[in-house]
């Protein structure tokens, strides 16, 4: 699926089309990833059901807050995006426009993601199982957390799944048009299959969400990523006895993806895989376009570190892979 300025819509369509054309006239190359980010902002702003384009402080804060729990680079990009659009609207004479202050935009250069140990992941699963035994609302999280760790999928990818995307005949999940416009197939084992059958909307229509929002009915709404991320930080981690702070940054549910990728790579090497062969396989599993993106993405445990680094250097020297992973995760 190709995303262009023709995809902009609603009362903000003129704003976004004009913004892209203005930036391009200055020599900026607006590729797919930038347009996709603006389209997400367009979709968010249209939820306010306005008659004319405005940008209030509450709207800007809400846009940024919905990404709480995601990578600092994602939040940084969202803050920069909402500020730039606000500046453009202000300069074009739109009324009631809030410009997000530059001083509030976070610097992410010193960020290092958190890697959960196997023991910590076991504590997380135990914690959510206890919570689920006390309250039915946590049943979804029993499946969601196991799905995230078993597949290294992104939270948004799991919540975007439709009933037709989970094939219980072949035990394969299809992730459609994810980040970098990549579609991929992810196999799952019998253990995860049981959880998917228990926690998913297996009786829904093919185009229904596999994890629909509570009381969604026929509205077609899915669960909100923000709600999942916040509950993980504020409820599940404390219940598991894990400090939510990793230095000056909070541990995020997205760190399960990092941890899963590291565990997969370590396991493949333990099975005797050549690291050179393992990295491309893992890159495909994660939905990356290039091997370099996978190497940068992983924060490896000490086991096999030298082997992986040497393999990565070999790959770069051979000129394989493209560093085309989006800045925001």
How would you label these PLM feature ranges?
Residues 1-329:
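Conserved catalytic core of the tyrosine transesterase superfamily
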């Amino acid at each position: 699926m190709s995303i262009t300025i023709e995809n902009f819509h609603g009362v903000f369509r003129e704003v976004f089309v004009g913004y892209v054309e203005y930036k391009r006239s200055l020599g900026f190359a607006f590729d797919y990833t930038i347009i996709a980010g603006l389209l997400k902002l367009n979709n968010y702003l249209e939820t306010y059901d306005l008659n004319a384009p405005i940008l209030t402080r509450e709207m800007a804060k809400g846009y940024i807050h919905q990404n709480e729990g995601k990578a600092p680079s994602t939040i940084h990009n969202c803050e920069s995006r909402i500020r730039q659009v606000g500046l453009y609207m202000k300069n074009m004479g739109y009324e009631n426009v809030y410009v997000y202050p530059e001083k509030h935009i976070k610097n992410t250069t010193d960020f290092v993601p958190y890697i959960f140990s196997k023991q910590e992941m076991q504590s997380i699963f135990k914690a959510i199982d206890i919570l689920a035994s006390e309250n039915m609302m946590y049943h979804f999280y029993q499946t969601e957390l196991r799905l995230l760790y078993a597949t290294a999928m992104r939270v948004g990818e799991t919540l975007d799944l439709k009933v037709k995307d989970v094939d219980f005949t072949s035990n394969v999940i299809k992730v459609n048009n994810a980040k970098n416009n990549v579609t991929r197939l992810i196999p799952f084992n019998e253990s995860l299959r049981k959880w998917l059958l228990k926690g998913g909307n297996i009786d829904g229509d093919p185009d229904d969400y596999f994890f629909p929002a509570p009381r969604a009915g026929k509205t077609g709404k899915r669960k909100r990523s923000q709600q999942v991320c916040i509950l993980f930080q504020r409820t599940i981690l404390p219940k598991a006895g894990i400090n939510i702070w990793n230095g000056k940054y909070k541990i995020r549910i997205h760190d399960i993806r990092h941890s899963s990728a590291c565990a997969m790579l370590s396991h493949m090497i333990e099975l005797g895989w050549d690291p050179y062969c393992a990295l491309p396989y893992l890159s495909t599993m994660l939905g990356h376009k290039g091997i370099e993106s996978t190497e940068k993405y992983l924060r490896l445990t000490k086991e096999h570190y030298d082997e992986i680094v040497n393999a990565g250097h070999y790959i770069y020297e051979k000129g394989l892979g493209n560093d085309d992973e989006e800045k925001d995760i």
